[in-house]
Amino acid sequence: MTRLGWGRRMVFGAALAAVAILGACNGDESAERNRLPGFVSGSVRTTAYDGASDDLLTAGLGKTGLGSASAPGFANAARPTSAELRRLAIWSNYRALVDMSANGGYGRFWGPNVDLDGNDTLGEGKIPGTEYLAYSDDGSGSKNVTLLVQVPAGFNPAQPCIVTATSSGSRGVYGAISAAGEWALKRGCAVAYNDKGGGNGAHELMSDTITLIDGTLANAVLAGTSSLFTANVTSGDLATFNSRFPNRYAFKHAHSQQNPEQDWGHVTLQSVEFAYWALNEQFGPLIDGSRHGVRYRAGDIMTIAASVSNGGGASLAAAEQDTRGWITAVVVGEPQINVRMAPNVVVRSGGQPVPSFGRPLADYATLANLLEPCAAASASLAGAPYLSALPVATTQSIRTQRCATLAAAGLVSGADTQSQAADALAQLHAAGYLADSDLLQAPMWDSQAIPAIAVTYANAYTRSRVTDNLCNFSFATTNPATGAVAAPATSPMPAVFGVGNGVPPTAGIDLVFNTGAGVDHRLATPDASFAGALCLRQLWTNGMLGMPANVDAVRVNANLQGKPAIIVQGRSDSLVPVNHASRAYVAQNGISEAGRSQLVFYEVTNGQHFDAFLPVPGFDTRFVPVHYYNLQALNLMWKHLKNGAPLPPSQVIRTVPRGGTPGAAPALTSANLPPISAAPGANAITVGAGAIDVPL
């Protein structure tokens, strides 16, 4: 690794210099100076990686290191270096979005060693190149969206390409490195990353410690506007809060009071513009012996907006908002997207209207958080994967007690746990959750994915401060044995940039309900903090604290302006239900774009939201990797843009689960993963005039 500091350009030796000279001789080049976009705050950190000791894709770990369950360590655990934090962040984020087991496909169907044709030819898969790192800000010093551009050494300036890799979830800037960055780097494309203004920013309130852009720590006051995130709390209020609620943490997505989701499309476009600047710095002509001119202008570079989950939603929003031709095409997986639905839109399955579609996340996530623990007790869900560190008896008690409390509140019917659980599950079905996702209702709550999302997004959509303790929830370190809030043996802050996902519980920081001094929300009351879950639900149903307006601010119109686009989603997705996301978006697109639309949709049976869960017993036997189809979709789009190959029409892809014994499923093979068909026949999804009909 070579670092030349902030704002200085990297040159990769004679070969790259020769490319720059050739570029300067091109008569089509302009003498206009390449200027850093005005939204870039401060200077740019530029770092070169040799592809041996360190690299763009694996941080020097290679295929073997990324595949190891042992995280890369720190020489000094209390003060890790920025290079160590980057390595850990790449390791953890890569692994968070794909199945890392060999039987599940890592190293065979995907991975640094697997080439674009699916063959094991790339060895350890290390990729040399340059990174450009900077903040985007609005002048306030409080936005500080992290932008990162990776330019591989194999980038061809005569045939330039960019792929966006907007972070999934609320992850840091490397959050989509396996979902989109890897494919792009193998194609020789520059990668435009951004953290969406959530960025895993944490603020340890008692020590007033924050992270900087590279994950290293600083005092919040001393850091000032260089902080990734500092809670907007006066010193007096902070002292009062710390005395009443010690060992608490603020997180950027939840507590920035900026509703960052409303800007996800905008910052994705900024990441592309920043990538143009970086490419002009490397390949633009020299105009005065030291400064570079503009070789590439908006629209000159083939750019695919790509990512998954929240990053997928951001990509769609960016394509809708693009007015300068920054984005050529879109390829997204399982997009979390809130669609502004026309009243005449219809979503059908097997010719029959589905009971509910197009709900925003604020609606379905708070409902699921309320009902899932009870629904999980249904006998029809027996054998669902168990995804909790709690004893089974504790989890069963939570389910029974949540059902009883829901019944007492008149929110479910039934005289016993089984009838109450059946009613809770029926309500989820009525709210648009597919029966295909039934066996995932329990693990989505048990893993705390749904509670975490409900709390974080409720805070964001109400622009709440950390000191508000919205619905009596907060984020804190706890005693592992009891769940009670407690001072940590060692602060989680040194590693939070490396291992955190931005949505507690994460990186040793838990989601707590503030009963007494505060307890893990699952253990705070017998019914797992029902009062807090009901409060979150009522914020939406009663339109409280500005939530409806802030949710409306994140909605999109499903107008991609005629850009070719592919959406891939698993039918069994129970985190972002397909009726509310992809199906709704495609149906609305039929009105918003009508005849201009070039959008196709591939719905994957036996596909769910978290490929990283696939090694878990019961996941391995039932579900297939959606990531595989995301990669196929990217390849299809590449051939479409480069060669004019038609995109296969919208269709259901009927996969075959691996089966076998939970925890010991047979190895994934191509027989489990049928190709996307050019002629899907009876599996074709019908789309038009505001209606979508998905075959059963």
Curated annotation (Swiss-Prot):
Q: What is its EC number?
A: 3.1.1.22
Its EC top class is hydrolase
Q: Does the keyword Transport apply?
A: no
Give the UniProt keywords, A-Z: Hydrolase, Secreted, Signal
Q: Which GO terms describe its biological process?
A: butyrate metabolic process
Which residues are catalytic? 309 (charge relay system)
- Predominant subcellular localization, coarse grouping: secreted
GO CC, sorted alphabetically, is: extracellular space
The residue ranges crossing the membrane are: none
Q: Which Pfam families match?
A: 3HBOH (PF10605)
User: What metabolic or biological pathway is this protein involved in?
Assistant: Lipid metabolism; butanoate metabolism
User: According to its UniProt record, which reaction does this protein catalyse?
Assistant: (3R)-hydroxybutanoate dimer + H2O = 2 (R)-3-hydroxybutanoate + H(+)
Coiled coil residues, start to end? none
Q: What is a GO molecular function of this protein?
A: hydroxybutyrate-dimer hydrolase activity
* Entry annotated with the keyword Translocase: no
Where in or outside the cell is it found? Answer: Secreted
Renumbered to this chain, the signal peptide range is: 1-20
Q: Which HAMAP family match?
A: 3HBOH (MF_01906)
Similarity comment: family membership: Belongs to the D-(-)-3-hydroxybutyrate oligomer hydrolase family.
Role noted for this protein:
Participates in the degradation of poly-3-hydroxybutyrate (PHB). It works downstream of poly(3-hydroxybutyrate) depolymerase, hydrolyzing D(-)-3-hydroxybutyrate oligomers of various length (3HB-oligomers) into 3HB-monomers.
Name this protein carries in UniProt: D-(-)-3-hydroxybutyrate oligomer hydrolase
What is the organism of origin for this protein? Answer: Burkholderia lata (strain ATCC 17760 / DSM 23089 / LMG 22485 / NCIMB 9086 / R18194 / 383)
Q: What is the lineage of its organism?
A: Bacteria, Pseudomonadati, Pseudomonadota, Betaproteobacteria, Burkholderiales
